[in-house]
Amino acid sequence: MSAHTYKKFENSTSGDLPDKMTIYQDCMNTFNESPVNSKRCRLLISRLLRLLAQGETFPQNEATALFFSISKLFQHQNDPLRQAVYLAIKELSGISEDVLMATSSIMKDVQNGSDLIKPDAIRSLTYVLDESTAFSAERLLKSAVVSRHPSISSAALCTSYHLLPISEVTIRRFTNETQEAVLDLKQFPNQHGNSEYYPNSTYISQYHALGLLYQLKKTDKMALLKLVRHFSENNSMKNQLAKVELVKIVNDLIYRDPQLFSQFRPLLSDWLSNKFESVQLETAKLITSFATRNSRLVAPELYAAAISALQSLLTVPRVSSRFAALRILNRISMVSPEKIVVCNPELESLINDSNRNISTYAITTLLKTGTSKNISSLISTITNFIHDVSDDFKIIIIDAVRTLSLNFPQEWKSILNFLIDVLKNSEGGFKFKNSIVEALIDIVSFVPQSKELALENLCDFIEDCEFNEILVRILHLLGKEGPSAPNPSLYVRHIYNRVVLENSIIRSAAVVALSKFALTKNDPTLYESIISLLKRIANDKDDEVRDRATIALEFIDSARNKDDVIAQNLIESKYFYDIPSLESKLSSYISSNTDSFATAFDVNQVRKFTEDEMKAINLKRKQEQIFNQKSETTLDTTPEAESVPEKRADANSFAGPNLDDHQEDLLATKYADELLSIEQIKPFGQLVNSSRAISLTEPEAEFVVRGVKHLFKDNVVLQFNITNTLTDIALDNVSVVCTPEISDEAELEELFTLQVDRLLPSEEAACYVAFKKLDEIVMEGFLNNLTFTTKEINPDTNEPFDGDEGFQDEYEIDSIFLNAGDYVKSSFTGNFSATFDELPCEEVAVFNIQEDLSIQEVVDKIILNSSCLPVESTQFAPSDSNSHTLKLFGKSALTGSKVALQIKMIKSSKGLALKVHGKGEDSLLCSDLVNGLMQ
């Protein structure tokens, strides 16, 4: 039937849906006619299915009436019509009542129907059977599973798979038949007679049978092992999807028990050379993802073979295979870029691939494999390419280059020249240009030696920039960084041009930027010029511009002639407020208004950061984004990836909580607010530092406890967050007894303990133990016991029974350690080597770690213990090297004194040797941090 004839009741060029009520009435009338017009019925069913496919639905009573009318068409022996009927039954069964009435008609077709409609009838059983009626189809399904016809067998296996959650007992009765179907090479009738009506068999029933068999045996590890051994022998699998499923079963097994990997090594090696590209891809994906989590169990030869297989797939004609191989290599490049350097020639050839998804993936993968030796050549390779792609792909490439600039700050010149070239010479929209400017801002912030060149080029760019938002950002950057540059007068001319030539939004931003140059110490002669310009601008016709110029003049006069510190800070800000904390405090201030705002908002209660601290926070967040990307590459390939639980806000990990930055900052503010609201702790003064929360019990324990260390100038407060997971027990008088490990030489004096009066089931509360420090820096370990009185809960009142005195008990929890890292905050330095050489105090220590830890695991532990900021991207240890140097920088949370660590690591058969070289302004902090680094 031609498409024109089939669609004669619709406008073939229109996307409009047919009227729902018209279709309903036509169906009800036509399906009940006698004799049945099969051609007309098929047409109406197709129009009905189109409605349902587009999201239209019918009320339950109308859907049920349609279902009954359609079920009458079972009496017609036209096979094409019956096929359409089964499609309609499938769609209507979810919104109709009493669908079981069609079961007998479907059963007849399953038993006596032709080979054409029998598979459709079997598939529709899924939608009409329930737990009470599924057993009636057992015999029919069992015989269909072992049918010699591939379509019938596949339909029965798929139906059984979908009935498994409904009636598992019934489906388990034909496990043996399912296992036979895996090895049975089913073929269509007359396949060898070259009949035009039957295609060659793809043996898809093997895949369906194996999928069902896995679901039946997935809880039995030994059964799965036997299944893999049995089906991997003698090349019995002919269908490539079945072979891919077998690889996934192996992946599931080694995910549960990594020690099984050695048993499958020969099999995996054989699969890497399989004739099917999909099998090679799935096997390479399995090996590389497993190696990310268990590198010691994967032989270098096998890993190299997996990379070689992916490398060969980069040159195959099939686009999907090239893309899949490239995607796996891209994931590897996030974790171990050095291992795919051998693929660079193939990756470079894909840069000009006609498929832009492939070409973009190729270039971003190449950039991730960059080292200090080949960055220049990579940048030159993509310079011409980037001008020929769309903005979306350009942004992806710029983001990759931005990451490269953070990983290799010493190569800033070639990266900066590339970004400037693209910014000036490439056409693109706002998002593209903004991504380049963000990358340049990162380079200026985190690579100080690049500042002068970057700012000069940005000055040239704003002369022709068409985007207001980007102009405002660049003007803000010039106002922030320009006054401290060697030649600040260079930027004043460009900024003033914007005041003269642009609209009010740009001119307002330019006035603010211009005012910041008045107090620059690098060129005091600028003062008179800036004052003259601002006085001229103060007569501007636009009030936004005029007001800013007027207030800037007032601030400058107060700061220069009256030594007004507040005015000077407003012009040259030395501190940055914690924005999430400020937002939270303002929201609380507005919502708790009791005196019509007679009491002014106290900005001193908001956390402030110095410029170095702010840069350290921003750099650490960017590093954690890269770290999280690497973690995702391992999660994406595990069988349980979708069920990985979300981390708590106070989870303990180097990479930080699995939250956005806003929530993470609010957590620190929450701690400070809770402590300052406690009367006994208020006299301690301002909170200096808080640690990350540390798990002190197992997550599945009866009482889940997490500890947080809070540091004040002369005091230490230990906070214990306790969760009662028992459902019928309440805890009274809950407290933690903290005993210093070295009690006879304790440098802490316990002041008080704040207990929790009552902790009901599923509730969480905090108890506190406060100490007075006898020295400025105290390092101590605490043995902890949770003490409480248990009382049984009355389920009617959800309170303990009256008169129940309870039972006193205690619960030992893990120790908590106060170390030197708790006295340190992350801080940023643009030139680590120069800063390290300038610091006066020095301390050296050597450690020999006997535990079987990788260099990366030790790096993570050191960063967590020291609380310092890793610089020059040394937080990522190369996986193919036995040595690494970690560089850390921080400041004392108490005094602000600088401390820097340079840690050299060498791994050998005897263990891991560490040489820690620390330098700082405070000899005591430097010594304690170096010597207590591995505690």
From Swiss-Prot:
There is a cross-link at residue 647 (Glycyl lysine isopeptide (Lys-Gly) (interchain with G-Cter in ubiquitin)). The modification Phosphoserine is found at residues 643, 653. It is found in: Cytoplasm; Golgi apparatus membrane; Cytoplasmic vesicle, COPI-coated vesicle membrane; Endosome. One of its GO terms (biological process) is protein secretion. HEAT repeats lie at residues 258-296, 337-372, 373-410, 412-449, 524-562. The modification Phosphothreonine is found at residue 638. Residues 630-656 are annotated as: Disordered. It comes from the Eukaryota. GO terms for cellular component: COPI vesicle coat; endoplasmic reticulum; endoplasmic reticulum-Golgi intermediate compartment; endosome; Golgi membrane. Pfam families: Adaptin_N, Coatomer_g_Cpla, COP-gamma_platf. Its main location: cytoplasm. One of its GO terms (molecular function) is structural molecule activity. It is a peripheral membrane protein. Keywords: Cytoplasm, Cytoplasmic vesicle, Endosome, ER-Golgi transport, Golgi apparatus, Isopeptide bond, Membrane, Phosphoprotein, Protein transport, Repeat, Transport, Ubl conjugation. InterPro entries: ARM-like (IPR011989), ARM-type_fold (IPR016024), Clathrin/coatomer_adapt-like_N (IPR002553), Clathrin_app_Ig-like_sf (IPR013041), Coatomer/calthrin_app_sub_C (IPR009028), Coatomer_g_Cpla (IPR032154), Coatomer_gsu (IPR017106), Coatomer_gsu_app_Ig-like_dom (IPR013040). Belongs to the COPG family. Present with 77900 molecules/cell in log phase SD medium. The coatomer is a cytosolic protein complex that binds to dilysine motifs and reversibly associates with Golgi non-clathrin-coated vesicles, which further mediate biosynthetic protein transport from the ER, via the Golgi up to the trans Golgi network. Coatomer complex is required for budding from Golgi membranes, and is essential for the retrograde Golgi-to-ER transport of dilysine-tagged proteins. Oligomeric complex that consists of at least the alpha, beta, beta', gamma, delta, epsilon and zeta subunits. Interacts (via C-terminus) with GEA1 (via N-terminal region) and KEI1 (via C-terminal region). This is Coatomer subunit gamma. The gene is SEC21.
